């Protein structure tokens, strides 16, 4: 009866487990059978309703073996409703990119089992790999990230590390070059020529030309004059810019010397050569005159000569007589001043009200501009004489009689220049000479 009761109890225990849909946990206790005694141990299975299912033996007997045994997971299930899930731990400093190479030394004691003894770095990596494969999937985010990063780091460590960097030294291409010798630096990097160097160039060339001309004339005529070198220098000055040509004769107030093949010295008077150089700019073509800068202390006469109202150097009486014969208000002319000074180069002659007015045109050297009148009642400045004439064709000019200062001031527009002014003045001058 006892053996049959035991067998029945085991079957009923299995039947109870079949009808209950309970997922068995890992650490479960199965009944252990004892063939010698013929008894069975009670099957202890944790149920969702936290009640133990014990099979009854017929006759009111129970299996009294291991009745005091309690499963540790059964206690864990009782405490499960009171458990709380804490927030994720903060990311450790070793998980940043700049400290990933130190992760092995910082996390290895946490991931390895406590009984593991690591002697070298290679053994640490092997134990870590095997431990990661055995552990189940974690639930927390930080644990998952640690596993992923640790696995990735082990893969990276399998590749050979690059050799250590050598000591920091400047490469040859960045090292400073030794200083070049002064002769080579002056030969390849010559400074820009200045004005004194430009002056020395024509003097050297002119001396060579003098020697060539003198040598050729000695072979042909066997007699040369001291003045023969001056025309050759004049030809050279025509080819060179006028500023350089004039400077070639200025340094020395001494006479220019040239050596011939026999070693004799031929002297050329400096005054004659300077005179030839002074006339050379007028003989130059128009291309070379562009390089010459106008004299800042002398007004430009070329712009004035191109206008029909400029007559040049004539006497005051001759111009006034011609304007009186014309007898038209607003008729005007521009002539050279009789004083021939740089401060007052021109005179504006205007006919108005049966009178002829002579107004001086001043040149201001400080700002290189022109002004009309004495400047006592205004000092309006212009860039050229043409600007003065154009301005007073649209605005009236104030005319004051110097002899009669109490007279009424008059205003007049410049209407027209005197027609055929030069022809009339030449006729007037020829008649005056015959008389």
Swiss-Prot record:
Pfam families: SH2. Residues 290-303 have a biased composition (Basic and acidic residues). Residues 226-249 have a biased composition (Polar residues). GO terms for molecular function: protein-containing complex binding. Disruption phenotype: No visible phenotype. Expressed in T-cells, mast cells, natural killer and natural killer T cells (at protein level). Expressed in cytokine-stimulated hemopoietic cells. Induction: By cytokines such as IL2 and IL3. In natural killer T cells, by alpha-galactoceramide. Tyrosine-phosphorylated upon BCR cross-linking. Tyrosine phosphorylation at both Tyr-69 and Tyr-96 are required for BCR-induced calcium response and are essential to restore PLCG2-mediated signaling in BLNK-deficient DT40 cells, but this phosphorylation is dispensable in cells expressing LAT. Interacts with the SH2 domain of PLCG1 via phosphorylated Tyr-96. Tyrosine phosphorylation is increased when complexed with SKAP1 and FYB1. The record marks 335 as: Interaction with FYB1. Residues 160-165 are annotated as: Mediates interaction with PLCG1. Coiled coil: none annotated. Residues 178-182 are annotated as: Mediates interaction with LAT, GRB2, and FGR. Changing residue 153 to F: Loss of phosphorylation and loss of interaction with PLCG1, PLCG2 and VAV. No effect on the suppression of natural killer cell activation and suppression of interferon-gamma production. Transmembrane segments: none annotated. Keywords: Cytoplasm, Phosphoprotein, SH2 domain. Its main location: cytoplasm. Residues 155-303 are annotated as: Disordered. GO terms for biological process: cell surface receptor protein tyrosine kinase signaling pathway; immune response; intracellular signal transduction; mast cell degranulation; negative regulation of natural killer cell activation; positive regulation of natural killer cell cytokine production. Residues 309-418 form the SH2 domain. The N-terminal proline-rich region interacts with the SH3 domain of PLCG1. When phosphorylated, interacts with PLCG1, PLCG2, GRB2, VAV and LAT. Associated with a tyrosine-phosphorylated polypeptide (p92) in response to immunoreceptor stimulation. Interacts with LBR and AGO2. Interacts with FGR. Part of a complex consisting of CLNK, SKAP1 and FYB1. Interacts (via SH2 domain) with FYB1; this interaction allows SKAP1 and FYB1 to promote tyrosine phosphorylation of CLNK by LYN. Interacts (via SH2 domain) with MAP4K1. An adapter protein which plays a role in the regulation of immunoreceptor signaling, including PLC-gamma-mediated B-cell antigen receptor (BCR) signaling and FC-epsilon R1-mediated mast cell degranulation. Together with FGR, it acts as a negative regulator of natural killer cell-activating receptors and inhibits interferon-gamma production. Acts as a positive regulator of both T-cell receptor and natural killer T (NKT) cell receptor signaling in CD4-positive NKT cells. Together with MAP4K1, it enhances CD3-triggered activation of T-cells and subsequent IL2 production. This is Cytokine-dependent hematopoietic cell linker. It comes from Mus musculus (Mouse). The gene is Clnk.
């Amino acid at each position: 009866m006892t053996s049959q009761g035991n067998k029945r109890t085991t079957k009923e225990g299995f039947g109870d487990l079949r009808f209950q849909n309970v997922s068995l946990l890992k650490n479960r206790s199965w009944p252990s059978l004892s063939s010698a005694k013929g008894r069975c141990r009670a099957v202890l299975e944790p149920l969702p309703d936290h009640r133990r299912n014990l099979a009854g033996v017929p006759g009111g007997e129970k299996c009294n073996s291991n009745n005091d045994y309690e499963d540790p997971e059964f206690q864990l299930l009782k405490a499960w409703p009171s458990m709380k899930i804490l927030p994720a731990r903060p990311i450790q400093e070793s998980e940043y990119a700049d400290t990933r190479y130190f992760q092995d030394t910082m996390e290895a004691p946490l991931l390895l089992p406590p009984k593991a003894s690591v002697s070298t770095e290679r053994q640490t990596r092997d134990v870590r790999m095997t431990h990661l494969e055995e552990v189940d999937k974690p639930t927390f985010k930080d644990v998952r990230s640690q596993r992923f990063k640790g696995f990735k780091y082990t893969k990276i460590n399998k590749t050979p590390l690059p050799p250590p960097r050598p000591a920091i030294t400047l490469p040859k291409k960045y090292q400073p070059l030794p200083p070049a010798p002064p002769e080579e630096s002056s030969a390849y990097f010559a400074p820009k020529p200045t004005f004194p160097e430009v002056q020395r160039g024509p003097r050297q060339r002119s001396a060579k030309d003098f020697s060539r001309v003198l040598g050729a004339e000695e072979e042909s005529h066997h007699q040369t004059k001291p003045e023969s070198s001056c025309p050759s220098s004049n030809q050279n000055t025509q080819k060179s810019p006028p500023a350089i040509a004039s400077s070639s004769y200025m340094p020395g107030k001494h006479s220019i010397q040239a050596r011939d093949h026999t070693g004799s010295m031929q002297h050329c008077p400096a005054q004659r050569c300077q005179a030839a150089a002074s006339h050379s700019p007028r003989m130059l073509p128009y291309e070379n005159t562009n390089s010459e800068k106008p004299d800042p202390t002398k007004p430009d006469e070329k712009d004035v000569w191109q206008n029909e109202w400029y007559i040049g150097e004539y006497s005051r009486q001759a111009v006034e007589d011609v304007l009186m014969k014309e007898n038209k208000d607003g008729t005007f002319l521009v002539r050279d001043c009789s004083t021939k000074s740089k401060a007052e180069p021109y005179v504006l002659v205007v006919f108005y009200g049966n009178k002829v007015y002579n107004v001086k045109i001043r040149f201001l050297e400080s700002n290189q501009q022109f002004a009309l009148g004495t400047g006592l009642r205004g000092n309006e400045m212009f860039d050229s004489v043409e600007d003065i004439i154009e301005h007073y064709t649209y605005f009236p000019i104030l005319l004051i009689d110097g002899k009669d200062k109490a007279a009424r001031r008059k205003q007049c527009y410049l209407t027209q220049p005197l027609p055929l002014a030069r022809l009339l003045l030449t006729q007037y001058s020829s008649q005056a000479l015959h008389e």
